[in-house]
């Protein structure tokens, strides 16, 4: 056997020297490639191998460098619904068919982004989902210690046999955009349930962002301890091998070896799993051009008020990180404001972790080229995974339609607090952006079903004076203004709206049927 080992080595070396030219897995049959930008195509081949890439009539060649990694750029193209073939010719020939040019949207976050259309109790959506202009690539989950270059997954065309596995939020987003614009949409889903935002950033970002320092310190401490434990384990294994040799010689059974230490940020190390998902599921996508990001995450970061307040800086750090990674400084980033969950608190003040978190999400709109689709009104008391993903996806699509697709008259958001001032004695007057034709009371009565309510029914507001004793307020609509008062508050100064984990009484909308974001005006 020992004589055969060198031969196996030579055979492996010979096969490696004549490895097939390969494309990155993102370039597969049915792929959507980003329009209006130079198209980067990349993969692997032998050092020195000439690689020629063609897409339709466009063709470009290069010689593979010593690293074995090649990348070419094809001239940018407009959106096209005509399928094309992508061909790579080296020592072998690789062809990918049914390629469209359109917009690729990265769908990331936790389980509510991962949630498939098949789990939404919407069989009509699946039955009618056949559309060659909507495609989906699901990135296989991978926690990685170091940045990876490749992923596992495949492209699928929307249809009754495939759409059940699509990200539901992504699918409803794409369905609306395609209907309005005719531009092919590729959904690049890279999401994992139960994950913190810290999982999705590069290590450099984690280390350089002050608010993330506790996670960075925990990461360094855990990795240092892991190295100590690993060295001790190697010594224990050496001792075990020697001891077992004697046991075997004496005719005894072999015992179990010492247990290997677990890597501290692997799949089973549930919290916080820093960096590892960026390494495994974002880093490999970096050269693949995308139009923007759809982000539904936060349940794992909303556990308490302190975490909620910090989220704006964490999200700012991650957005900057991703825009740098994808080489697009103004990349659109649209997030979902957390849906309501569990029973409504009877405490007038509210102020739990989820309410603080939603307010941080609202304030994150100050980050340029971002948008927020509120889902606060379409939650589920009993399920952290509400089935109504249609309104979530379509509300995200509104931002894209206005900011990416030029539909400038689109109402993209529900009312957002603009300012507050004292009115007549005993009242506060609130002004709102995104009034959308006027403020009103309303409710959602199912997917895509908005029902107006009498103006006198507006709820969800509480006010307080300097004493910070909160009282439920009566709200009156005055055009794009809300006037608040409460019998127990002579000199109101502060207001909160929908400031609970599940604010079922918060029902302020604009006439476009979009809900107001929860907020607070008292200092935190």
Residue ranges of predicted features:
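Positively charged n-region of N-terminal signal peptides that target proteins for export
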Residues: 1-4
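Sec-dependent N-terminal signal peptides
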Residues: 6-8
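N-terminal signal peptide c-region/cleavage motif recognized by signal peptidases
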Residues: 13-14
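Cell-envelope and extracellular/periplasmic
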Residues: 19-524
């Amino acid at each position: 056997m020992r004589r055969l080992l060198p031969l196996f080595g030579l055979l492996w070396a010979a096969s490696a020297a004549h490895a097939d030219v390969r494309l990155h897995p993102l370039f597969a049959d049915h792929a959507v490639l980003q329009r209006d930008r130079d198209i980067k195509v990349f993969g692997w081949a032998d050092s020195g191998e000439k690689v020629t890439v063609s897409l339709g009539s466009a063709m470009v060649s290069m010689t593979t460098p010593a690293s074995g990694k090649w990348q070419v750029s094809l001239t940018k193209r407009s959106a096209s619904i005509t399928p094309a073939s992508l061909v790579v010719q080296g020592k072998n020939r690789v062809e990918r068919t049914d390629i469209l040019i359109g917009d690729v949207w990265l769908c990331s976050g936790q389980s509510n982004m991962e949630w498939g259309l098949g789990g939404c109790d919407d069989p009509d959506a699946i039955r009618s989902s056949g559309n060659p202009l909507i495609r989906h690539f699901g990135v296989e989950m991978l926690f990685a210690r170091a940045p990876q270059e490749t992923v596992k997954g495949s492209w699928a065309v929307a249809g009754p046999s495939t759409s059940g596995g699509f990200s539901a939020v992504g699918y409803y987003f794409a369905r609306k955009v395609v209907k309005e614009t005719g531009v092919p949409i590729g959904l690049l889903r890279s999401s994992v349930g139960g994950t913190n935002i810290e999982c999705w950033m590069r290590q450099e970002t984690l280390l350089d962002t002050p608010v993330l320092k506790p996670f960075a310190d925990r990461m360094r401490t855990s990795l240092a301890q892991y190295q100590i434990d690993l060295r001790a384990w190697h010594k224990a294994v050496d001792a075990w091998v020697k001891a077992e040799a004697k046991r075997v010689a004496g005719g005894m059974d072999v015992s179990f070896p010492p247990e290997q230490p677990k890597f501290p940020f692997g799949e089973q190390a549930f919290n916080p799993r820093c960096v590892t998902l960026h390494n495994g599921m974002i880093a490999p996508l970096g050269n693949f051009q995308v139009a923007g990001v759809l982000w539904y995450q936060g349940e794992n970061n909303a556990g308490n008020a302190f975490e909620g307040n910090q989220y704006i800086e964490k999200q700012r750090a991650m957005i900057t990180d991703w825009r740098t990674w994808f080489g697009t400084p103004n990349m659109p980033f649209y997030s979902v404001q957390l849906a309501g969950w569990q029973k409504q608190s009877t405490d007038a003040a509210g102020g739990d972790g989820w309410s603080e978190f939603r307010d941080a999400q609202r304030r994150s709109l100050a980050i340029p080229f971002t948008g927020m689709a509120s889902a606060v009104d379409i939650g589920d008391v009993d399920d952290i995974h509400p089935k109504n993903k249609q309104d979530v996806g379509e509300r995200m699509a509104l931002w894209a339609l206005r900011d990416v697709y030029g539909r400038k008259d689109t109402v993209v958001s529900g009312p957002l607090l603009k300012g507050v001032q004292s009115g007549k004695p005993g009242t506060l007057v609130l002004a709102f952006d995104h009034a959308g034709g006027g403020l009103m009371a309303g409710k959602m009565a199912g997917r895509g079903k908005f029902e107006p309510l009498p103006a006198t029914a507006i709820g969800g507001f509480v006010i307080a004076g300097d004493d910070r004793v909160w009282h439920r307020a009566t709200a009156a609509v005055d055009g794009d203004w809300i006037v608040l008062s409460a019998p127990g508050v002579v000199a109101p100064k502060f207001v909160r709206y929908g400031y609970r984990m599940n604010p079922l009484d918060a029902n302020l909308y604009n006439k476009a049927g979009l809900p107001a974001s929860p907020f607070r005006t008292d200092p935190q």
